Amino acid sequence: LKAPGEWGADIAVGSAQRLGTPMGFGGPAAGYMTTREAFKRNMPGRIIGVSVDRLGNKALRMALQMREQHIKRERATSNICTASALMASMTGFYCVYNGPEGLRRAAETAHLAAATVARALEAMDYRLASKEFFDTLEVEAEAAVVQSLALEQGINFYYPSEGRVRMSFDEVTTAAEIETVVSIFAAAKGKKAKAVKAVTESCVPTALRRQSPYLQEPVFNAYRSESALMRYIKKLELRDISLANSMISLGSCTMKLNAAALMQ
């Protein structure tokens, strides 16, 4: 889909769960928040930039620090930051491993699965809440009937109201699962499901499709094997410091000394 900034949005927020994080029975998952350059100083948290050290080597440094409450006082924004660092790291490495091509394939697979089900349901005279969709469909149907049939097949749809059923698809949705979904809605109308014909072309309107590049940084285009990715993760780990290496200097809310005797 087209980037929010190309639509004129100043701020965009959302969930990053779809980027490699399992559902986990509801959570946790990382989220994202992005803004135009003009508003970056109003962003919560810390923004890290690339600079050079005194020897001329590239170095990461804090380009913008907005969290410290002793500095910002009543204007501090740390209260809207969360400690989902592990989830954010998983999301980042998922993007590193898959790169722009992999993310496009995943998005297309999810969309075509939704489009295949949408076409099959419309052929059975079901009405979609919207003709324009990416990976999620909302269908007008008798929710109680569909729910009973779906549970028999081990499928849990979302039922926003008595007359609506909602479902989402992803890159691991199989043809067998698609056929099962279609058969459930066929049974709800007392019909027998016909053979499902896969949709192979995007249904997203041209005006909504993204044309601009993304994930162009070298790190998102360098690691395509499991071994290469693991070596990269290990390289980053060796740059970190922990209590296994030395005491962590007191300097901020995230750098304190936890003596081994206290970690029981």
Indicate residue ranges for each PLM-predicted region.
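Structural motif of enzymes handling amino- and sulfur-group chemistry
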Residues: 56-127
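Short beta-alpha connecting loops at secondary-structure transitions
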Residues: 11-22, 45-50, 70-78, 98-105, ...
